[in-house]
């Protein structure tokens, strides 16, 4: 299997440190708002990448953090008049709702920064002892000029980095690119004790510490959006390698940016489309299909019309699958030459730098074949195509997955049925029963709203 490694800029054969096991760290969200379609891209891409590694027989140990303390979280807390923890807890819960709706499997570990403050302090102390970090009045900083390989990941010279990038401004630093490991608290800010006074960890050190503590000093894959290459990943790498003297992550994988209205989709710019809205309007398979039909490293332009097109294409496949399920056999087909050929094409595509566009196009090809086989009343072939879509490839791509998708469809259908029954009850003035339905739904977070054009529902 070959993947493009940002560290070398080349497509390389993937060989894990421990045979058969892949240790992988993905930078997770800073939790101060709902996730948007841009954030959904790494979530879906690396979820499917992990499923594929498992499909190929690896055991995967995956870590995805939550950044639960940061300036943006503190600002949001101040805006809302609550403490930072309420903001973090709220948006972690919201993250889970969206991730679940999007069919993202939880990683094996979801560490939160604030649970690792003791480890972070200990590692910063070791960096200070090694002479690669120093203290000023405002905090503790990493001394970039002490780490020779700085710039290796982002492939930039130090001079260019200073000129081109946004660097943390602080009068007390020795060098513009030095970045904070520990920020001393201003009055009223959340803080933890440390040898340098009360304060909080910088953003980059948390990922270094959580990855090294959970996965070890060297691990296989470090992933995230390409906006993180500099400074975040360059800094994570510098801290870890200055600390241990070993290679930190051996392969770095970065997804391209989702653009919306001409810019990177971003909470800070405000040009966002939330995952919640996208899934509600166009279904989770529509969004997953849109994301997977672009190669993960290419930029991706988002528009609602495009998402709608993908959602329609997905519906057509569902219709074909539904037609088959009404009458067809859903047993296990024979693994014949055609079966093998499809598996080979699937593996060949995904082994080649995780080419999901080719893999999803196979699903659509199979759906067309299935439709034709039904027209021709060719039962054996139909079962084969059906099986390949729903049991062989579906679970890897998280699309048309037999076990998962059924539940989603049926809960929506059931809700529609309940609303219909309630309408009948109201027309017959049996308000005791109709109110009971409304109240009970409200208790489980489904709010009904009666409008002149019918009853609508929202999920809280
Ligand atoms: N537009 C985008 N396209 C693709 N990936 C993105 C996009 N925006 C963020 N990501 C990725 O989503 C993950 C979580 O991002 P994070 O919560 O740190 O902030 P963010 O959404 O980029 O914040 P902001 O929107 O304020 O820039 C990271 O891996 C990041 O690279
Ligand atoms: Zn990170």
Swiss-Prot record:
Binding site for Zn(2+): 27, 207, 232, 236
GO process annotations (BP): cysteinyl-tRNA aminoacylation
Cofactor note: Binds 1 zinc ion per subunit.
InterPro entries in the cross-refs: Cys-tRNA-ligase, Cys-tRNA-synt_Ia_DALR, Cys-tRNA/MSH_ligase, Rossmann-like_a/b/a_fold, tRNA-synt_1_cat_dom, tRNAsynth_Ia_anticodon-bd
UniProt keyword Aminoacyl-tRNA synthetase present: yes
Gene Ontology CC terms: cytosol
Subcellular location: Cytoplasm
Matches recorded under SUPFAM superfamilies: Anticodon-binding domain of a subclass of class I aminoacyl-tRNA synthetases, Nucleotidylyl transferase
Entry binding sites for ATP: 267
Keyword annotations from UniProtKB, A to Z: Aminoacyl-tRNA synthetase, ATP-binding, Cytoplasm, Ligase, Metal-binding, Nucleotide-binding, Protein biosynthesis, Zinc
HAMAP family: Cys_tRNA_synth
Subunit structure comment from the entry: Monomer.
Family, as annotated: Belongs to the class-I aminoacyl-tRNA synthetase family.
Listed name of the protein: Cysteine--tRNA ligase
Organism per entry: Thermotoga petrophila (strain ATCC BAA-488 / DSM 13995 / JCM 10881 / RKU-1)
